[in-house]
């Protein structure tokens, strides 16, 4: 699968419109981590105003987490994006979401 097909598959899997997906990719691209989506948008249970839950398996260094949240808030993305700090997640939570993770970047 080429890069364009991969992007289309991810875009469809997380149930957001094309413009929001491009904004999300651009914001996440500023950070050296792999990001995964999980939750209602991945499970096909999203409603019109559902947020997008994002998780990084890697611990985010320094102020990267807060800067990422600010970058998302300052962007033109039309949905709320909830970024989870992996260092604050319990092992039970990680186990609960691991089957649903869809790599975004």
Q: Which ranges hold each PLM region?
A:
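Catalytic core of pol beta-like nucleotidyltransferases
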Residues: 1-37, 42-48, 57-105
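Short, well-ordered beta-strand segments
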Residues: 53-55
